[in-house]
Amino acid sequence: MYMSTDEIRRAFLAFFESKGHQIVESSSLVPANDPTLLFTNAGMNQFKDTFLGIEKRSYTRATTAQRCVRAGGKHNDLENVGFTARHHTFFEMLGNFSFGDYFKQDAIKYAWEFLTDVLGLPQDRLLVTIYETDDEAFDIWNKEMGIPADRIVRIGDNKGAPYASDNFWQMGDTGPCGPCSEIFYDHGEHIWGGRPGTPEEDGDRFIEIWNNVFMQFNRQADGTMEPLPKPSVDTGMGIERIAAIMQGVHSNYEIDIFQTLIKKSAEVIGYEDLSNQSLRVVADHIRSCAFLIVDGVMPSNEGRGYVLRRIIRRAVRHGNKLGASGAFFYKLVGPLAEIMGTAGDELKKRQALVEKILKIEEDNFGRTLDRGLTILNDALDNLSGKELDGETVFKLYDTYGFPADLTNDVARERDFTIDEEGFNNAMEAQRQRAREAGKFGVDYNESIKVDVNTEFCGYTGTAAQSSIVALYRDGEAVDSILAGEDALIILDNTPFYAESGGQCGDAGVLTAENTVFNVSDTQKFGAAIGHQGSLVQGALNVGDKLEAQVDVVRRTAITLNHSATHLLHSALRNLLGEHVAQKGSLVKPDALRFDFSNLEAVKPEQLREIERVVNEQIRLNHSIDTNIMDIESAKQKGAMALFGEKYDDEVRVLSMGEFSTELCGGIHAKNTGDIGLFKITSEGGIAAGIRRIEAVTGAAAIDALHAQEALLSETASIVKSDAASVATKVSALLAHSKQLEKDIQQLQDKLAAQESAGLLDQAKEINGVKVLITQLDGADNKALRGMLDEIKNKLGSGIVVLGNVSGDKVGLIVGVTKDLTGKVKAGELVNMVAQQVGGKGGGRPDMAQAGGTDAAALPAALESVTPWLTEKL
């Protein structure tokens, strides 16, 4: 039974919805609040905190069709993409999950039912693996599902340590783990390969299609396995693999999605042979590149942005290899959005932005691609061995933008390898970090864990009666603290807002009888809220009751700035376009910062219009309303979600009239009029395609305007003008200054010509060559260059060495007429002199310049020229 990829996706989600599972949308390819991951690479990523017990959800069963990327960091399939049947940078993982609900029996039953009943796969084509000692799973497969024992393969510890097995899954060195059961499809005897667990298992006959992970243990630091009180299930099935089976093909690249993209790639490149592997590379890479951009990643030279840039450039190089002329890659975005079906809805909304970013990146790389490939191929032609040195690989990266894996691709096609260690050493030596997967690593166990759910009551007030449920000093739990000690206090309820969504944490004071604790910051620790600060007087113990009082003045300033960011966000989208998406923010008492996606700098006139629109909304004094609703209703209302944030099923929707509607858990003003005034203080770029606006509100905005007025008044006074005419007066002064500089230069040129005529008499001959060596103090470098050209022209043939001292700086310039550059190079001569005055320089064979810092050494350095030239001439 043939099924399209989109039909399989729909059938899978509908099947598990019928089994009581909540359909959860694919999360962003940029993991939310998880620094341990470069990209989302599995369906369980968005549920990680739920499996760890840190986060609770309103459902215990879930199903997803998760977009994933594996390129960079630990999970890097990039170099194999296009050269094997099943490696991809982008793939979709179908999954069903149980959070302490059903376990092995139902997980296995559901998988079997979907594969055999819904998809209609023949049972004799399916084979399963289990962990060697998992008799429970064996009995379920054998006795309940009816799988013959000879089609159930036990896999033991095949990775050199206890529980180190292909069929035992673990999140890390410690934490949730358990056995897994994989389902394989047998493509038939006509394809080479052996069953799992045999030496031939890497063949293509038996292909894993579904993995069921049974999380039933909590691994301790000493290696012991403690049973989890509520075992869970995590499963994953690659949609491309099951689509190949349902469409009667063997390679993933033969399924409907890839065939469409391969044909479109050939069309835009102008290439006819659809079997070429480079077309596979292009077809795969457009998927990862397009969806990474949709999820907020922009091409750059670090982190996630650099991985995206590497993938784009690899695709462009393969298109170039097939004869592509001009930009072609961006033309595949439209076909991709159509063939992805329901999974392409978000891409359709942002198609124009994705196309624009890809075209700019492709055009930029195209300027250096041909030159870089020429250098690379020349280097390979001249190799005596089979390995390209790391310095050349680094030069291609540094000068021509060739990622090392792109260079490796070209080398591999010609049966060469690259010196990766040498490349990495060159990168380290120049302190350049192209790939830093390590910086995304963090140990969950290192953070403070508190099994407490602090009730937040700060939406309706700034004071509350609370009790201490935990105390931490230097990261360690303690029972009490004394005056003078810094600590973290966890309360049962609090009006203090913990830093989240860009809004900084509250400050204030916790008090009891004869006891004062100053709170400097408030942070989240799981579901607990921690108050960081110091005990000024008294002592505090776990269980003590106290009064929590937020700094109201500071809180009010923060709320004004936070509400202003919402107005700014909407103004940017209205004026610049819907491609604008928030990439980060910081809301402090004294200012706000807002980062957003935009390919170009915001023009001054656009900034003025943004300010005008925001201030207009402030004057309209909209009521700022909050409503709690389910996430789907919020989206239907048009509420904007913030980049990098995770949301519960029920969300807080904040509205400012019809102008702004966003999901937000922060604290805001009551009315937009409370903001008073909004003033932008700066705009600039912080990364490729990411801009930053900084602004102030209220009293701080008035202060900023006063500061500008004072500066304008001071400038007017300096130029002897009134404020209204200062621009005209400054323009006139600059024009006058420019004319004076021109007049001075003309005079200097005349003086140089006159002086150079007199200097010709000082020229001497060394072995038949005219040589002029002299020091001219007071002349600047520009004057020296003019004199050099004048003297060289009058000499006809000869060598000129001029030096000057200006303050404590030495200037040197050397000229060699072209008939003598075969004997004397200007750069070599100027460096010989420069080294003696504490400097260095360079230039062409006929003209070179240098600088130095040892003015006293200049006379002796110039005297050394004569013997040096005597040897050369």
Curated annotation (Swiss-Prot):
It is an enzyme of class 6 (ligase). Its cofactor is Zn(2+). One of its GO terms (cellular component) is cytosol. Its EC number is 6.1.1.7. Keywords: Aminoacyl-tRNA synthetase, ATP-binding, Cytoplasm, Ligase, Metal-binding, Nucleotide-binding, Protein biosynthesis, RNA-binding, tRNA-binding, Zinc. One of its GO terms (molecular function) is tRNA binding. It is found in: Cytoplasm. Zn(2+) binds at H562, H566, C664, H668. Pfam families: DHHA1, tRNA-synt_2c, tRNA_SAD. It comes from the Bacteria. PANTHER family: ALANINE--TRNA LIGASE, CYTOPLASMIC (PTHR11777:SF9), ALANYL-TRNA SYNTHETASE (PTHR11777). NCBIfam families: alaS. Consists of three domains; the N-terminal catalytic domain, the editing domain and the C-terminal C-Ala domain. The editing domain removes incorrectly charged amino acids, while the C-Ala domain, along with tRNA(Ala), serves as a bridge to cooperatively bring together the editing and aminoacylation centers thus stimulating deacylation of misacylated tRNAs. This is Alanine--tRNA ligase. It comes from Photobacterium profundum (strain SS9). The lineage of its organism: Bacteria, Pseudomonadati, Pseudomonadota, Gammaproteobacteria, Vibrionales. The gene is alaS.
